[in-house]
């Protein structure tokens, strides 16, 4: 399999390249309430403000490889839900428009099997092996982290990263 540097701070778009990476929006950014974020604890402050929730499908050479669910605290991100994310880098939008840069974080990696939702997005059989990465991404803004759950079809691509 070819390597994809998703396990880094740079983000998927910069690791793969904008030319071969496409992004389809499954659920447009919307504000919802939240009590937890993929198993990561939230502060009372984070819970009270709600989050911006979105789902994206990332394709490499038109093949679905990542199904990404993102939850971002709804705090000082004006017009975020009205932005276009189709074929755009989330990290770049956060950096350019909100002066937020990912500085580190925590990730949990687990092997699972494809459920109906994954079958629909990846076009694989039910039970197909899938890698799930739950991430808490810390930023340069003190006390501001956001969260993602990424389902990875590693059949043709492996995940790589330096540590």
Positions of PLM-derived features:
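Residue-level recognition of beta-strand microenvironments
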Residues: 28-30, 57, 136
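Anionic-ligand binding region
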Residues: 51, 56-61, 70-75
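C-terminal regulatory/effector modules of DNA-binding transcriptional regulators
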Residues: 47, 60-63, 75-76, 82-84, ...
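A short alpha-helix capping/helix-coil boundary motif
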Residues: 68-71, 95
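Hydrophobic residues on conserved beta-strands that form the core of alpha/beta folds
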Residues: 25, 53-54, 67, 132-133, ...
């Amino acid at each position: 399999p070819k390597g994809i540097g998703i396990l880094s701070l740079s983000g998927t778009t910069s690791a793969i390249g904008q030319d071969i990476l496409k992004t389809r929006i499954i659920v447009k950014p919307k504000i919802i309430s939240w009590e937890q974020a993929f198993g990561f604890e939230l502060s009372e402050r984070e819970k009270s403000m709600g989050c911006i929730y979105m789902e994206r499908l990332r394709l490499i050479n038109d093949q679905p490889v990542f199904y990404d669910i993102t939850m971002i605290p709804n705090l000082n991100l004006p017009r975020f839900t009205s932005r276009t994310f189709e074929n755009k880098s989330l990290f770049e939008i956060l950096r350019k428009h909100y002066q937020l840069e990912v500085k580190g974080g925590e990730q949990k990696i687990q092997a699972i099997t494809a459920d109906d939702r994954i079958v629909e997005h990846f076009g694989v059989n039910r039970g197909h092996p899938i890698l799930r990465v739950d991430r808490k991404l810390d930023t340069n803004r003190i006390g501001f982290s956001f969260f993602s759950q990424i389902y990875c079809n590693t059949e043709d691509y492996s995940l790589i990263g330096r540590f």
